[in-house]
From Swiss-Prot:
Entry EC no(s): 2.4.1.17
Protein name (database record): UDP-glucuronosyltransferase 2B20
Stored Pfam families: UDPGT
Main location: membrane
UniProt-annotated glycosylation sites, renumbered to this chain: N65, N103, N316, N483
Cellular component, GO, one term: endoplasmic reticulum membrane
Subcellular location: Microsome membrane; Endoplasmic reticulum membrane
Organism: Macaca fascicularis (Crab-eating macaque)
Reaction(s) catalysed by this chain's protein: glucuronate acceptor + UDP-alpha-D-glucuronate = acceptor beta-D-glucuronoside + UDP + H(+)
Amino acid sequence: MSLKWTSVFLLLQLSCYFSSGSCGKVLVWPTEYSHWINMKTILEELVRRRHEVTVLTSSASTFVNDSKSSAIKFEVYPTSLTKNDMEDSLMKLLDIWTYSISNSTFLSYFSKLQELCWEYYYYSEKLCKDAVLNKKLMTKLKETKFDVILADALNPCGELLAELFNIPFVYSLRFTVGYTFEKNGGGFLFPPSYVPVVMSELSDQMTFTERIKNMIHKLYFDFWFQIHDIKKWDQFYSEVLGRPTTLFETMRKAEMWLIRTYWDFEFPRPFLPNVDFVGGLHCKPAKPLPKEMEEFVQSSGENGVVVFSLGSMISNMSEERANMIASALAQIPQKVLWKFDGKKPNTLGSNTRLYKWLPQNDLLGHPKTKAFITHGGTNGIYEAIYHGIPMVGIPLFADQHDNIVHMKVKGAALSVDIRTMSSRDLLNALKSVINEPIYKENAMKLSRIHHDQPMKPLDRAVFWIEFVMRHKGAKHLRVAAHNLTWIQYHSLDVIAFLLACVAAVIFIITKCCLFCFRKLAKTGKKKKWD
């Protein structure tokens, strides 16, 4: 770490020492890529507010690493995995999810998806074990006396560290497949009649047929699909803690869940007191563009520009597909800024420039930006919402298809299928989004909703973390459902008891009726005999 940031940490320690005790120590268990981009925004704000932030990351991390331009501390622990292992696994997951399993039948799709999830969580478990079983590391962290743990719920382990150190923890999360962790670890409510199951690509306005589809998805995820080897994780947690427990039981102790969406994006649904929505917390006003880029944008005149990015996880695409996309972009009057890392397409038009990196937020906030071509990642969508820019979605994997469905239902986007689209499909979608005023109007409506909040999303996220530190938790917000078994939660024991009572009453009444009938029959026979 540089001398500059060593001095910063010293000043932070001194300011905390002389303050009224408002500074806290935060331990972070992160997840890679866009998850880290979002979480890092929270951490930088915590540091700005004089909290000491330590990120626990492995030597195999590809995205979460020490930055000399940041006051965030990084505790790097060794692992037998390598950066190549992590990158190869991710590229395999992206390729299969984007181009293979999307064409599968229902059962085949979820069977392949489960295989991908199990491979992902194999690496997650390995990283967790390498951290938790590192006695030197655990001793060092325990002696630091952290006040709270901030963890991404997608990667289990943060809750285990919290149990080991006996400190409260807060989750940051977008979603998990089938809402597995949210339902089993958080007690979230998802009524299937109007809340679409994640990855079902449905809206909250479902027809009878769509409700059947949604129910099938729910039942499949609840009773068949396993996001990871549950028994293996439960056994690992029990061994580490020295008592019988489960992953979900440990997750239920979360003080707060910070969900990275908001009602400008979500369909309305019920949620618990210890859940808050902080979508778009990374968004901010646009800054000036680099000189060369600004000149290119200004050269577009009244036609404006289109911003095109498929995110940080897609580094290249096939030559055929790139040429098809470039051909469509060449036919619009707007200038195009395309985030692209690959061979220059032969059909690239004079109106299109390729960049390995784009200041996406600053471009979306530029007054000349007319549309955003996006893969549908949550971070990118929120930047478009923040600045009121209509979208053309090219979803690839994970929640991206659902994200674009949300924007389509709200009238701020159109979508095309990357596996089947032609130049004409992309061109028509772009023309519609740019030339039909309704898309811009709806995008601006979402933007106004996003900005009209009593507290900014970032301030709200930091508030809850500080709240948990101040009060040593937030137990008063956790519903009693967390302490109930599955049978108790669904009142199956009560229903069984009441059914038994009804059965007993029916049995007694039946016996009494039979007894009376026999008595009457005997009396009748006796009178007849007499």
